[in-house]
């Protein structure tokens, strides 16, 4: 085996507008609170049960943070891909505390808006870099906000026209 994998994928809704701040270095950081929900039927009572889990997401990628600031609002449905990290901090009494966060680093991670902002009902995908070619804008308009490389027009050989007829 080649090592280990630390990858978190979430599809959920923002519980609040993104919190945008700047580090001492001047880098922009976005903090998101994302809710994921699951529902099931209780076998004994037949009653429908729901459970919501809240996730803290930190975006260190400046381009993705700008996208979050500009386009994301409370209630927006998003796809997030990042890594799980534990952050150690101290409370007011000096006690050590730990928080689990999904982190999108400068050149890793992905943010995809799943809500429609156009008539076509398609979402937009913004990548944080890496060595994958990926479609940065499914709707055909707008820019490649999260691209870190010089991939201006090509999408790894795939056509951007998603309405092509399937030959079978």
UniProtKB/Swiss-Prot annotation:
Pfam families, alphabetized: SSB (PF00436)
SSB domain span: 5-111
Compositionally skewed regions (Low complexity) per UniProt: 147-159
Cellular component aspect of the GO annotation: nucleoid
CDD domains, per the entry: SSB_OBF
Gene Ontology terms: biological process: DNA recombination; DNA repair; DNA replication
GO molecular function terms attached to this record: single-stranded DNA binding
Subunit structure: Homotetramer.
HAMAP family: SSB (MF_00984)
This protein's name: Single-stranded DNA-binding protein
